[in-house]
């Protein structure tokens, strides 16, 4: 239990990929899953609360329905497979955890449940109560109703968002690969990266966009995106191989993405968000001011795009096109556009009412 022991990680999120749970024929790898349940029980007895983000519903449902391409030939096939497979998946989890004396609970979430603040808080409260009761939540995206436009798209990022909602200190992404390499691990001389202190352009360049199994949807790009979200919320994230028995109780080789520091709940939620309703483009002076801890003033904004209301999440973009921050708008889109580049006196004339202190206040903003 060397990775994220209970003493330093009271709450742990474990994500399990489809290729680990389901064999190429679409059947559950029950013996392997029984070992995972034993690992979770061992950690629970040591005082750790564990939640599982479990893939596999589409793969299981596709087999039962006889759908081609693992149920991914169309969105409708994937939704039907997910609806069918979720029952089978939850039943298996309940059985293997029950054999260890643990109670399983199912939580199906959509992107909106974790992107909209009120729904996020509700989901977080449910998750917290389940964990405090000693229950093992089994979480998955509700693929039976989600569409391409309103879905996470992979369970790696979902696991990171769940970690944030649960205030977990650690996330383990169990996969068919044992971590990050400086190039495709199939190439000669590929070097395994054990510890990542900062996710920069060089780390992102190492990501492989493919999924080795052909069964899931999360390649290394999605795992690095998940690490960004988890680290911003103060949680460390490890990518580890699940191609061994009882991977949570062995010192399996892994890549660890280290969280720099904790984050406030609201700022962690902002940083982890996957969607923004609009964007503000700002000049170089405004970028410097934000880095220095200032709020975003209208005078530093050069362009406004998107349709948004007051309180919506906005991306804040520098002159080079890079997203430098994210925050909650103090204005609806039309009013924000009306005061672009203006000082305070000119803003009041343009709006017809006294302007707010900033377009995005520093208390409602996080640097990226």
UniProtKB/Swiss-Prot annotation:
InterPro entries associated with the record: AceGlu_kinase-like_sf, Asp/Glu/Uridylate_kinase, Glu/AcGlu_kinase, Glu_5kinase, Glu_5kinase/COase_Synthase, Glutamate_5-kinase_CS, PUA, PUA-like_sf
Keyword Plastid: no
Pathway info: Amino-acid biosynthesis; L-proline biosynthesis; L-glutamate 5-semialdehyde from L-glutamate: step 1/2
Entry-linked SUPFAM superfamilies: Carbamate kinase-like (SSF53633), PUA domain-like (SSF88697)
Gene Ontology process terms (BP): L-proline biosynthetic process
Molecular functions (GO terms): ATP binding; glutamate 5-kinase activity; RNA binding
E.C. number(s) listed in UniProt: 2.7.2.11
Keyword Transcription on entry: no
Transmembrane segments: none
SMART domains on file: PUA
Protein keywords: Amino-acid biosynthesis, ATP-binding, Cytoplasm, Kinase, Nucleotide-binding, Proline biosynthesis, Transferase
Primary site of residence: cytoplasm
Gene3D superfamilies referenced in this protein's UniProt entry, alphabetically: Acetylglutamate kinase-like, PUA domain
Residues involved in ATP binding: 15, 175-176, 217-223
GO cellular component term of the entry, any: cytosol
Described purpose of this protein according to its UniProt entry: Catalyzes the transfer of a phosphate group to glutamate to form L-glutamate 5-phosphate.
Record-linked PANTHER family: GLUTAMATE 5-KINASE, ISOPENTENYL PHOSPHATE KINASE
Similarity annotation: Belongs to the glutamate 5-kinase family.
Protein name from the UniProt record: Glutamate 5-kinase
Taxonomic source organism: Sphingopyxis alaskensis (strain DSM 13593 / LMG 18877 / RB2256)
Gene that produces this protein: proB
């Amino acid at each position: 239990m060397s990775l994220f022991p209970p003493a330093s990680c009271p709450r742990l999120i474990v994500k399990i990929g489809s290729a680990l749970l389901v064999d190429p024929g679409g059947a559950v790898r029950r013996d392997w899953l029984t070992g995972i349940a034993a690992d979770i029980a061992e950690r629970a007895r040591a005082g750790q609360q564990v939640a599982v983000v479990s893939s596999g519903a589409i793969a299981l449902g596709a087999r039962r329905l006889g759908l081609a391409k693992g149920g991914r030939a169309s969105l409708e096939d994937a939704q039907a497979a997910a609806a069918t497979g979720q029952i089978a998946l939850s039943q298996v989890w309940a059985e293997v955890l029950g054999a260890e004396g643990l109670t399983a609970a199912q939580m199906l979430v959509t992107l909106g449940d974790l992107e909209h603040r009120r729904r996020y808080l509700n989901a977080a409260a449910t998750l917290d109560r389940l964990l405090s009761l000693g229950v093992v939540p089994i979480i998955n995206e509700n693929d039976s109703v989600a569409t391409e436009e309103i879905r996470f798209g992979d369970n790696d990022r979902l696991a990171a968002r769940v970690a944030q909602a649960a205030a977990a200190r650690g996330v383990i992404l169990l996969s068919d690969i044992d971590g990050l390499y400086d190039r495709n691990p199939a190439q000669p001389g590929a070097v395994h990266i054990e510890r990542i202190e900062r996710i920069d352009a060089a780390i992102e360049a190492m990501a492989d966009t493919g999924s080795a199994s052909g069964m899931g949807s999360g390649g290394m790009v999605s795992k690095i995106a998940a690490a960004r979200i988890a680290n911003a919320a103060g949680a460390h994230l490890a990518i580890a191989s699940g191609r061994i028995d009882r991977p949570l109780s062995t010192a399996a080789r892994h890549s660890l993405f280290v969280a720099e520091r904790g984050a406030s709940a609201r700022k962690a939620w902002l940083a982890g968000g996957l969607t923004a309703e609009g964007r503000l483009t700002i000049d170089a002076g405004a970028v410097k001011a934000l880095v220095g801890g200032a709020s975003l003033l209208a005078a530093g904004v050069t362009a406004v795009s998107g349709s948004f209301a007051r309180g919506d999440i906005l991306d804040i973009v520098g002159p080079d096109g890079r997203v430098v921050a994210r925050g909650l708008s103090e204005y609806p889109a039309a009013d924000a556009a009306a005061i672009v580049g203006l000082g305070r006196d000119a803003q009041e004339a343009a709006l017809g009412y006294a302007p707010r202190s900033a377009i995005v206040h520093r208390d409602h903003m996080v640097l990226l």
